[in-house]
């Protein structure tokens, strides 16, 4: 009969520091941002007729990759027609390769519905009269030693405000000495619209 004993130099991965027999299924753990490598040494013992003979040990490793991670991304608020800021994804993961895939729930803003890697600057689009907010969800994937591990997603928003609009005021004809006022209105909603004006004939009593 051959039996086996083993020792593990890194029990933090979720495997005991030593044991006998086969290593049963276990849930591994790595709370850091770099791979953790555990070295396991297994020693066989052959027993027959009450005599035990120990054999040469064999060594193997269990590498536990960290969870893939992407740093928080700042939200953006843009005007219709503005160029967005380029978005360069970053991570605290090390000793491997982290790639990024993303989906955008509102491609009408001028950004594709999905993609991979960083997001280049694009011309923001909003032809409506109220703000449009797109939510972008990023999934990081960490690859090391040929094994890829997806991590928690990160979301951020890009809000595109509409072009400011003012309704066409009616021309006025009034008598000398009379008073009048003009109230500006807009079709814009979801924000605040302010108005600046200039008058080419201040002699009528209206500032320039």
Regions found by a protein language model. Give the residues of each.
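Extracellular low-complexity Ser/Thr/Asn/Gly-rich intrinsically disordered segments
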Residues: 1-208
């Amino acid at each position: 009969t051959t039996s086996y004993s083993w020792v593990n130099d890194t029990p933090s991965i979720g495997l005991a520091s030593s044991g006998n027999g086969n290593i049963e299924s276990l849930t591994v753990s790595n709370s850091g941002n770099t791979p953790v490598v555990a070295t396991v040494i297994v020693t066989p013992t052959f027993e027959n007729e009450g005599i035990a003979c120990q054999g040469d040990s064999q060594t193997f490793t269990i590498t536990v990759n960290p969870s893939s991670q992407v740093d928080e991304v700042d939200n953006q608020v843009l005007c219709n027609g503005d160029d967005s800021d380029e978005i360069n994804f970053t991570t605290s993961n090390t000793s491997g390769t982290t790639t990024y895939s993303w989906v955008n729930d509102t491609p009408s803003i001028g950004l594709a519905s999905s993609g991979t890697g960083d997001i280049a600057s694009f011309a923001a689009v909003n032809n409506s009269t109220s703000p449009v907010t797109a939510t972008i969800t990023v999934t990081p994937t960490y690859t090391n030693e040929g094994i890829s591990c997806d991590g928690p997603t990160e979301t951020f928003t890009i809000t595109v405000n509409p072009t400011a609009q003012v309704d066409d005021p009616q021309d006025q004809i009034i008598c000398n000495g009379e008073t009048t006022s003009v109230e500006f209105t807009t079709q814009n909603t979801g924000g605040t619209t302010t108005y600046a004006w200039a008058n080419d004939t201040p002699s009528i009593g209206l500032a320039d």
